[in-house]
Amino acid sequence: MISVTTLKDRKVALFGLGGSGFATARALVTGGAEVTAWDDNPDSVAKAAAEGIRTEDLRNIDWSQQALFVLSPGVPLTHPKPHWTVDLARAAGVDIVGDVELFVRERRAHAPDCPFIAITGTNGKSTTTALIAHILKSAGYDTQLGGNIGTAVLTLDPPKAERYYVVECSSYQIDLAPTLNPSAGILLNLTPDHLDRHGTMQHYADIKERLVAGSDVAIVGVDDSHSALIADRVERAGVKVVRISRRNVVADGIYAEGTKLIQAAGGAMLPFADLDGIQTLRGSHNAQNAAAAVAACLAVGVSADAIRAGLASFPGLKHRMQPVGQRGRVVFVNDSKATNADAAAPALSSYDRIYWIAGGLPKAGGITTLAPYFPRIAKAYLIGEAAAEFAATLGEAVPYEISGTLERAVAHAAADAERDESAASAVMLSPACASFDQYKNFEVRGEAFVGHVAALDGITMLIGPATGEK
């Protein structure tokens, strides 16, 4: 745990006692701050109180005595309207921050030179974050992985020289981290997202820009207009910018030509790595993720050979285009995290012959946007509440069956793929749906898929065992 010592003996108000909020409260208390915490959920308040954290409705505290207000990233700061605690803090002139800002302050106070890589973007954050951490760990570096990827940043080991931090940052976390200053900051891309919380696309882009604007080295994907403008603007402000692209040549940076990553510097274009054959980095979207990881690792001093070795051994992100088993020429892919059509598109674009397991609790829009990938689908196996709707969309374009359950879909898809005498194929769970009609969450759905695959005869598992339980 990182004890927040920079607020020792000072009064701090905190709202939000979920996962990261609870961890933040503990880190503040351990560091000696006088914390008063609250949450709208009585169970969360009771849990904090049982751990010795002082709890009180923040409507009743003296805000003029608070040195700082810590807000959990899931609580609205600006849109659709500020949370009531935000209004109280602003009325009293109290600064509002989040857990990433507290981490930044502790690093600055105790180990300002320890390498810190921060990653943001609309898509690809988690894969890029996990890939960077894997490369660093494989190269023997003391590596701490956290942030929006699922591990609260203040639960990591304390900052010290030669300890490397890899932190995924959501727009909400950046908005609450005014002095964010990573050694290498990555902005992968920008498309409209979370506008219910940020109001406009411009405001959303402005928040994302803060991460790279404060970086020693800014690594920016320039395949969308918003990010390209940010790269130019940050560069004019004096920040060193490394551009990355999966579509176009860049003058100084890393770009992709098919599966090859090219390093451009000083007018030279040098091959850096080839992703061909790396199952966990298939697709042009992963070429961009890999380019960002390469640029970041080079920026913090990792050797080219160590980076190449890390790329080749990357196990992938769980439930995201994750190869889990192999039988002959058939690979079994767990893409359970694809809970809408846009999220399913990268996996469908990455394989040429697919036995597609799809369905669950449908999202607005269905799968109509996936029509360009229908020629890649040998057959679809439809499950859950969305089965009938998806069947209507597929029509005569794609052969399909309504399997109903995931277990039946896996068995039928595996049998059909094995009989397929054409090129290598993939049995893929990429549901384009939420899981809640049949499973607690997409993780449980993914583990169930892995379990059903493991139960097939003649399977070579590419990952550890799974329970397959719902």
From Swiss-Prot:
<dbReference type="InterPro" id="IPR036615">
    <property type="entry name" value="Mur_ligase_C_dom_sf"/>
</dbReference>
<dbReference type="InterPro" id="IPR013221">
    <property type="entry name" value="Mur_ligase_cen"/>
</dbReference>
<dbReference type="GO" id="GO:0004326">
    <property type="term" value="F:tetrahydrofolylpolyglutamate synthase activity"/>
</dbReference>
<dbReference type="InterPro" id="IPR018109">
    <property type="entry name" value="Folylpolyglutamate_synth_CS"/>
</dbReference>
<dbReference type="InterPro" id="IPR036565">
    <property type="entry name" value="Mur-like_cat_sf"/>
</dbReference>
<dbReference type="GO" id="GO:0008764">
    <property type="term" value="F:UDP-N-acetylmuramoylalanine-D-glutamate ligase activity"/>
</dbReference>
<keyword id="KW-0133">Cell shape</keyword>
<dbReference type="GO" id="GO:0005524">
    <property type="term" value="F:ATP binding"/>
</dbReference>
<keyword id="KW-0547">Nucleotide-binding</keyword>
<dbReference type="GO" id="GO:0005737">
    <property type="term" value="C:cytoplasm"/>
</dbReference>
<dbReference type="GO" id="GO:0009252">
    <property type="term" value="P:peptidoglycan biosynthetic process"/>
</dbReference>
<dbReference type="InterPro" id="IPR005762">
    <property type="entry name" value="MurD"/>
</dbReference>
<keyword id="KW-0573">Peptidoglycan synthesis</keyword>
<dbReference type="GO" id="GO:0051301">
    <property type="term" value="P:cell division"/>
</dbReference>
<comment type="pathway">
    <text>Cell wall biogenesis; peptidoglycan biosynthesis.</text>
</comment>
<dbReference type="Pfam" id="PF08245">
    <property type="entry name" value="Mur_ligase_M"/>
</dbReference>
<keyword id="KW-0132">Cell division</keyword>
<comment type="function">
    <text>Cell wall formation. Catalyzes the addition of glutamate to the nucleotide precursor UDP-N-acetylmuramoyl-L-alanine (UMA).</text>
</comment>
<feature type="binding site">
    <location>
        <begin position="121"/>
        <end position="127"/>
    </location>
    <ligand>
        <name>ATP</name>
    </ligand>
</feature>
<keyword id="KW-0067">ATP-binding</keyword>
<dbReference type="GO" id="GO:0071555">
    <property type="term" value="P:cell wall organization"/>
</dbReference>
<protein>
    <recommendedName>
        <fullName>UDP-N-acetylmuramoylalanine--D-glutamate ligase</fullName>
        <ecNumber>6.3.2.9</ecNumber>
    </recommendedName>
</protein>
<keyword id="KW-0131">Cell cycle</keyword>
<dbReference type="GO" id="GO:0008360">
    <property type="term" value="P:regulation of cell shape"/>
</dbReference>
<comment type="similarity">
    <text>Belongs to the MurCDEF family.</text>
</comment>
<keyword id="KW-0961">Cell wall biogenesis/degradation</keyword>
<keyword id="KW-0963">Cytoplasm</keyword>
<keyword id="KW-0436">Ligase</keyword>
